[in-house]
Structure formats: structure tokens, C-alpha cells
UniProtKB/Swiss-Prot annotation:
FMN binds at S10, S16, Q17, S18, M94, Y95, N96, F97, T138, R139, G140, G141. This is FMN-dependent NADH:quinone oxidoreductase. Belongs to the azoreductase type 1 family. Gene3D superfamilies: 3.40.50.360. Quinone reductase that provides resistance to thiol-specific stress caused by electrophilic quinones. Also exhibits azoreductase activity. Catalyzes the reductive cleavage of the azo bond in aromatic azo compounds to the corresponding amines. Its cofactor is FMN. It catalyses: 2 a quinone + NADH + H(+) = 2 a 1,4-benzosemiquinone + NAD(+); N,N-dimethyl-1,4-phenylenediamine + anthranilate + 2 NAD(+) = 2-(4-dimethylaminophenyl)diazenylbenzoate + 2 NADH + 2 H(+). Homodimer. HAMAP family: Azoreductase_type1 (MF_01216). Its EC number is 1.6.5.-, 1.7.1.17. It comes from Shewanella baltica (strain OS155 / ATCC BAA-1091). The lineage of its organism: Bacteria, Pseudomonadati, Pseudomonadota, Gammaproteobacteria, Alteromonadales. It comes from the Bacteria.
Amino acid sequence: MSKVLILKSSILGGYSQSAVLIDHLASHWETQGAAITVRDLGGKDVLPMVDGEIASGLRGGAELSARQQEMLALSDTLVAELKANDTIVIAAPMYNFTIPTQLKNWIDFIARAGVTFTYTETGPKGLVEGKRAVLVTTRGGAHKDGPTDHVVPYLKTVLGFIGITNVEVVYAEALNMGPEAHDKGMSEAKHSIEQLKA
């Protein structure tokens, strides 16, 4: 049985197009027997903003404040959740040409030297290996493979840095460029999702 972690990151609630696609993917994969865990980073599972105190605490140490200990424990939970699943599905709507703050927060909690990556004499090495990632990205305009897409290249870089290099991408583009373009973008994305195996 494939174990899947789904990360939602939209802050738009019922208006979220990425949530529609993620729910479609979850339903499709559940019929294939996948065990799915959902973390709604833009909703009920929103994470604290990583500030200087938290960032310092995530490096560990003997003299951590109560808040730092709590945030380190949260980070450990998120990392364990990441490592426990075979496939990581990331909903990545484009907000102002990049990913939502809520998703960046998750990255800041799990990207830890000595835990999810390490530095060697030949450069960095990811420690989260043998995983697959699926990015589901929605955007109001058309940005795929262009200089204004700072979503997919960034996420591929981060995932590769921690060891996840098997990355598939589902695009839903031009969603704000009129009803016809919206329907076409969503239809093509749903079709792409239906071709994916859990």
C-alpha cells in the first residue's frame, strides 16, 4: 500500500482551485488503495511563522527556551511525517509569482542540516531519499517554463536539496484568463491527475 502525504497550502478556502485538484487526486488515489494523510497548511494545520528564535532553536542545543523546545518537537513531527510517506503531494498555487507563505513555513521547519540534508566535502547531500513528489500548481496566468514561474523551479530545487529528485508536475494555468481558459486549464489538470498512479 502506497503511503501519501498531501500538503495543501491555499489560503482561499472554498475558492481554492488547488484544493479542488488535490481533492480530485485524493479521491482517485484512494480507489487505488493509497493511505493518505492530509496536512492543510493554509487552514487547520497552519504553522507558526519561523522567526529568529525558532530558527535558532531548530539547530538544537542544551539551553532552549520552552517555545524553542515546542517548535523543535513540531519540526521533528513534520520531518517524521515526511519520511514515513512514499509520495509527497504538494499543492502549490502561485501567489505573486511564488509559493504561499504557509508552504514556505513548512519548508523552513523541515529543511534542517543533519536531519534532512547534510554538507559533505563534495557539496550538500539530501537525506530524504527514495521518495516521489507530485506538485499540483495553479496559477491565474500562463507561466509554465517561463521566467515568471518561481514556483516549480524553486520547489524542485528544495526537494532535490533534501534528496527527493523524482518529481512530477501537474499544471493548471490561465485560470483567471476567462471562463473558457479556466475550464480548459482545470480539465487538463484533472486529466493529468487521472494518469498518475498512487
